[in-house]
Amino acid sequence: MKRILFFAHSSKYTLGLPQGFRELNCPVFILRDLSRSSITDAIDNFRPDIMITMGWAYRRYSREYIEELTKRASKYKVKHVYWATEDPRWTEKCSFRCIETYKPNAVMTIHPGSVNKYRELGLPAEHLDFGCNPQFNKNEPPNSKYDYDVVLIGNGGREWKSYRKDSVQILLKPLVERGYNIAIWGKRWDHFNEELMGFKIPTHMIKGELPYEETNKVYNSARIILGLQNDHDMLTSRTFEVLGSGGFLLTVPTQSVTKLFTNNVHLSCASSPEDTVNLVNYFLKNTAARQEIARNGQREVYLKHTYKERARQILDFCNLVERN
């Protein structure tokens, strides 16, 4: 099997896709930080067939070490795939910068509409969704620390120019304004732009940043998890992670959501603030219905959207690129 070098620092990545490759019997080396010794271990000693980078990979490291990594990878003819996990909002500022810096052989993107942008650059490109890792995203006993009616895990926007703004106003605003038992984790909520967004979030609802390792506990402890979406044509990682955990997901009915999941079977969708209030009231009172949908959602992502399946897609893509 192919040997996989996975270059990522954040647990939100290292606890995901690498497990999928392991389940396909691919040896995996996780490279979290760059130094001369770590590059030697990852490239010269491990001798990978495929290197995967992603996200804002160019920002954490010095140019010297990045060039050393790509030079060594090229020397041993390692196939380099960049996974564009910040598309489409940050394609120019993030993905294109990473491509310029790391010079990958091919690109996979979470946004189907961005595929042709990479092909126009002369790079083989395909779509690859996020997924779930059943070894991490799974049922576990509730934790009283996270016992809330409604929770939201996700960062507040910087400029709120994407569909994420609409998601917040449909899902979060009506519940905050009515004083529901809500907890919000993530960056920048303490600098929330009240004037732009049209409502104020009480400070007791804002809980700060949450280690990724804690997220599954939250999903298993809260009764309803709000799932913001950033774009009509892509799905956030938390969509799959919440469902994989067995949590009940309330999101918005974007094209991508309704393409993969059935409303009130795998998750629930609110099209307006009024929908959100009605659905939250209903599902807080109807525990059995809420739990049945959560079980269905977990079953669906375990069947079709695990990182084992995503790893298989990457291997198939790499084989296709090699043949062409």
Q: What does each model-found stretch correspond to?
A:
Residues M1-F46, G55-E68, A106-F240, F248-T258, ...:
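Nucleotide-sugar donor-binding catalytic core of glycosyltransferases
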Residues N45-F46, Y102, H305:
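Active-site charged/polar residues at nucleotide-handling catalytic sites that mediate phosphoryl
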Residues A73-E86, A106:
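Active-site proximal beta-strand in glycosyltransferases
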Residues T91-N105:
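Membrane-proximal helix-turn-helix segments that form the acceptor-binding/catalytic region
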Residues L267-P273, Y282-T287:
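Conserved acidic donor-binding segment of nucleotide-sugar-dependent glycosyltransferases
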Residues T276:
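Catalytic phosphate/metal-binding cores of nucleic-acid and nucleotide-processing enzymes, i.e., regions
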Residues A289-L303, Q313:
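A short, well-ordered alpha-helix in the C-terminal region of glycosyltransferases
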Residues Y307-N324:
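C-terminal alpha-helical cap of glycosyltransferases
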